[in-house]
Design a protein with these regions (language model features):
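Sec-dependent signal peptide cleavage junction
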Residues: 15-52
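Bacterial Sec-dependent N-terminal signal peptides
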Residues: 1-23, 226, 238-239
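Mixed-charge (acidic/basic) macromolecular-recognition segments
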Residues: 165-237
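Aromatic-patch recognition
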Residues: 53, 61-191
Length: 239
């Protein structure tokens, strides 16, 4: 009886996810799909992540503090059903490896990723070349045609006098319109008009009015129909 009891204790101790061997992967289906670490070796080829902003009133992540369902494409290979958080303060994405460890993905290897949130899919691309207007790093791609529409998210922090808090984060977003190979930051519909083909502006205005579109910087996706229509009529105009 004593021998059996000792064997049971040994099994419990060495199979516990809280054992001292932190290198042993304890895959949780609630965190990641239960395929092998070897199959995702490239995905986990990053650095161990630690939270530097525990005492901030608002988190550094986009959309949610929780890990969101998503996909990641690294060196042209796509990984599905990945749990992700997008840190828009540092412009990095992280994923849990097991119950204990979280890894920050190797940004140089990431081509693109997506997040599922509130019933919508958000697609991001990694712009790896340094360019003007802060158009680099992870950027949400809203539309791609003859022209393109992107959104860059960011959070800046401000300090706090509260001894229980290090500060808070303030989220900002910048809309980018790309046409004819040129990048334009868009602060509203009026700034968009300034970079459209002059002879098509009135037609675009008529379309917005007749379609009763509400276009606002607060809702970057509201520009999609406008840009799509502009692409259609500019295609006719230039052919």
């Amino acid at each position: 009886m004593s021998l059996i009891l000792n064997m049971l204790i040994s099994i419990i101790v060495y199979s516990s996810p809280f054992s001292e061997d932190k290198l042993t992967p304890h895959i949780c289906s609630g965190l990641q799909e239960p395929d092998s670490i070897q199959n995702r070796q490239e995905l986990y080829n990053g650095i161990k992540w630690t939270n530097k902003y525990r005492k901030f009133d608002v988190s550094q992540f986009l959309f949610s503090d929780l890990f969101l369902q998503g996909t990641v494409t690294m060196n042209s290979k796509t990984y599905d059903n990945i749990r992700l958080k997008y840190d828009i303060v540092n412009d990095e994405i992280i994923t849990p490896v097991n119950l204990e460890d979280i890894v920050q993905l190797n940004k140089e290897m990431v081509d693109s990723f997506s997040l599922q949130y509130d019933g919508r899919k958000y697609n991001f691309v990694n712009i790896k070349n340094d360019t003007l207007n802060n158009f680099s790093g992870y950027i949400q791609q809203l539309y791609s045609g003859r022209s393109s529409l992107f959104v860059k998210y960011n959070k800046s922090f401000s300090t706090s006098d509260d001894m229980n808090s290090d500060g808070t984060f303030n989220e900002t977003q910048t809309i980018y319109f790309i046409t004819e190979g040129l990048i334009y930051p868009i602060t509203g519909i009026r700034t968009l008009y300034k970079v459209l083909m002059p002879d098509l502006i009135d037609e675009v205005k008529d379309y917005i009015r007749e379609s009763r579109l509400k276009v606002s910087k607060k809702n970057p996706a509201s520009f999609i129909d406008v840009i799509r229509y502009y692409d259609a009529i500019s295609h006719i105009n230039t052919d």
